[in-house]
Amino acid sequence: KPNILWITVEDISPTLSMYGDSTAITPNLDKLASESLIYTESFTTVGVCSPSRSSLITGMYPVSIGTHQMRTGKDVFGWGSREYDGISNAIDVNGDSIPLHSVVTPPSVKCFTEYLRASGYYCTNNSKTDYQFAAPVTAWDENGNDAHWSNREANQPFFSVFNFDVTHESKMWLHRDKPLTVDPKKVPLPPYFPDTETVRNDVARNYSNIELLDQMVGKLILELKADNLFNNTYIFFF
């Protein structure tokens, strides 16, 4: 059985050289793209974070399973230190209590990794489970910042997810004190943005974060090659 590696990223749009925008220097992604099938006409089922992720993990439309409203789970970021009543004796894959207002999907709705695990795959998630519903403990063999295919049994096929959030919109401010690697004077600006120093710096930060992302992808591919797994692994980048 082949191995499967998902590399998921956030908030970059098609701002990559394989889609015609070479502002960010991304040698690792360029190399991967040159050896890959590139999708140029793809669509999302819903255009916001968690509802979209619920569709990816279940293979179902969010409106069909009640996960289309952002947000309906626990306060994952602790904004306002909200208090809520939990469902009695119910915890999610992270060991957290499940709030009463969480989406409860129909019993027939499964995380597709449950089927992969039943087929012998070692499934790891590093590390988001922000699905709008509580991920069941049966979804992953490993879940968290240390989850990795290297912990599987010898010769066991794996399905591994690495969610790199370095390009998440919030990181434009988190990394605001770090040096820019892309010149603000050279970034393309959409016509609906004012051409100001602040806007150019923000856009340059986004492109600089894409260059950081490229390094992370390169490191992951090197790990595959070091483990002699690269030639038997399907890699999805989206």
Predicted ranges, named:
Residues 8-9, 126, 237-238:
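Generic enzyme active-site microenvironment
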Residues 109-135:
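Short, charged N-terminal beta->alpha structural module
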Residues 6-8, 13-107, 121:
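Active-site segment of extracytoplasmic enzymes that catalyze sulfate/phosphate-ester chemistry
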Residues 1-5, 35-40, 118-124, 155-159, ...:
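Loop/turn elements at helix/coil->beta-strand transitions in domains of secreted/extracellular proteins
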Residues 14-24, 47, 70-72, 78, ...:
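Active-site-proximal cap/lid insertion segments
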Residues 6, 27-30, 110, 114, ...:
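Solvent-exposed, polar/charged alpha-helical surfaces in well-ordered, non-transmembrane soluble domains
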